[in-house]
Amino acid sequence: MSFNTFGHMFRVTTFGESHGVALGCVVDGCPPRIPLTAAEIQRDLDRRKPGQSRFTTQRQEADQVKILSGVMETERGQVTTGTPIALMIENTDQRSKDYSDIKDKYRPGHADYTYEAKYGIRDYRGGGRSSARETAARVAAGAVARKVIPDVKVRAALVQMGPHKIDRANWNWDDVTRNPFFCPDATKAAFFEEYLDEIRKSGSSIGAVIEVVAENVPAGWGAPIYGKLDSDLAAALMSINAVKGVEIGAGFGAAELRGEDNADEMRAGNNGPVFLSNHAGGILGGISTGQAVVARFAVKPTSSILTPRKTVDRAGGETDILTKGRHDPCVGIRAVPVAEAMVACVLADHFLRHRGQNG
């Protein structure tokens, strides 16, 4: 299997499966002499790890990260050396027996059939590499990326669950840390609690929309045509499990606007142009404008539900399937820290590419 690596100058390779011994990543291209400790990486992993509320999978994983290479102790503390940084997270709470009854059946909505169609083999134990468990490694890599671009603030929030959207007038970033949904609207978070409880108890699942905002991105990152910043952001977010759509700035909403409404007008400021709106999401022509970079993505409902579903088996026979195991009733919740990590990695990559070309 190829395509386990992304990035150009800040390159991340992830490895491991849902029910394997461990998973992790190798970060190549991180500049030297950057302070980096396991505790800093752990803070991000703790936001993503499972089992923290009844609204996420009850699989209990500590997700303790180990730094295997790429750092050393100095008089300034632990810093990067410029060599590849290897990070490992052990799996400790696998229950592969939950999948033994369905190992020859293709789960609807999962990658079971497509993996087998491509490779002639698949890891049925929790989905193997197609499991969202893989994203723990991405979050670890994202923590390293944040250290490369310390002035850039990357934050994400859940802004819609099912058909229910937050009230943007109530947006408060502080509220994101005060509820289990990473929701910036405290009133809507209380509603989500009742709403998702009902869905969870029925054995079903629901989708969500996540918004990512990167502030303090200077003008000039990105490149025209095939190196566009928004193209790389879209690809990175689209690579997250269960994501089915990505938009930048006004996104699909721009199709409903007239030209005079969509184009972000400018006025002169002390340090360059001041934009009067941000429908472009902080990117024009594939290059950052200096405004906040804004992206949103849609996450489909978790495919593993407690309702019997129609499917086929490996022999081609028609059958029914009932998925066991422990699953998120709304996988969009834990996609929030994953999205931050992916955006941080892309921005760190573009920072290094910009510095390499322009000094």
From Swiss-Prot:
Keywords: Amino-acid biosynthesis, Aromatic amino acid biosynthesis, FAD, Flavoprotein, FMN, Lyase, NADP. GO terms for biological process: amino acid biosynthetic process; aromatic amino acid family biosynthetic process; chorismate biosynthetic process. The keyword Cytoplasm does not apply. Gene3D superfamilies: Chorismate synthase AroC (3.60.150.10). One of its GO terms (cellular component) is cytosol. The keyword Ligase does not apply. It catalyses: 5-O-(1-carboxyvinyl)-3-phosphoshikimate = chorismate + phosphate. Its cofactor is FMNH2. Its EC number is 4.2.3.5. It is an enzyme of class 4 (lyase). Pathway: Metabolic intermediate biosynthesis; chorismate biosynthesis; chorismate from D-erythrose 4-phosphate and phosphoenolpyruvate: step 7/7. FMN binds at R129, S130, S131, N241, A242, G285, K300, P301, T302, S303, S304, R326. GO terms for molecular function: chorismate synthase activity; FMN binding. Reduced FMN (FMNH(2)). NADP(+) binds at R48, R54. This reaction introduces a second double bond into the aromatic ring system. NCBIfam families: aroC, PRK05382.1. Belongs to the chorismate synthase family. PANTHER family: CHORISMATE SYNTHASE. Homotetramer. This is Chorismate synthase.
